[in-house]
């Protein structure tokens, strides 16, 4: 999926009232400190990272995390879940934006980021590719939340 596609999907949900911007990291922010509801500004937040390395085949990260419905996490806890997950996966210093979706029976979050750092280096996806390791941050998140 392209960065534009990942952001457009989430911003369409925001415009429809079935999602909201929950948090962000290293994003162009509004006066309240949240990522802007202007998709153009979100695209600009990622631009330098993508321009630093045009050779990476899949530079976009679009993650969905779905806590159990009975957990009923607050917005603050969902934002914390996203932050801890991104840290554990090695993307904690990347720009990312977290959306809360309420368009299904289970409230869940989507995280959009890029896999290239500021210097143009591809962030290792070895942690992502190992099912054992992928389940570790998720399992830790389940225990924590």
Locate each region found by the language model.
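N-terminal nicking endonuclease/strand-transfer module with a His-rich metal-binding environment
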Residues: 1-135, 139
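Hydrophobic alpha-helical segments, chiefly the membrane-spanning helices
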Residues: 143-145
């Amino acid at each position: 999926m392209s960065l534009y596609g990942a952001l457009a999907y989430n911003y369409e949900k925001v415009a429809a009232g079935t999602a909201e911007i929950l948090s962000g990291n290293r994003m162009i922010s509004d006066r309240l400190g949240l990522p802007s509801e202007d998709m153009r500004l979100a695209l600009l937040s990622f631009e330098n990272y993508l321009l630093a390395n045009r050779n990476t085949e899949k530079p976009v990260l679009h993650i969905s995390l779905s806590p159990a419905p009975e957990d009923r996490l607050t917005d603050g806890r969902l934002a914390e879940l996203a932050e801890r997950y991104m840290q554990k996966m090695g993307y904690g210093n990347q720009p990312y934006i977290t959306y809360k979706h309420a368009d299904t029976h289970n409230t869940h979050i989507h995280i959009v980021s890029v896999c290239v750092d500021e210097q143009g280096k591809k962030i290792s996806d070895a942690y992502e590719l190992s099912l054992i390791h992928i389940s570790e941050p998720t399992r830790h998140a389940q225990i924590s939340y």
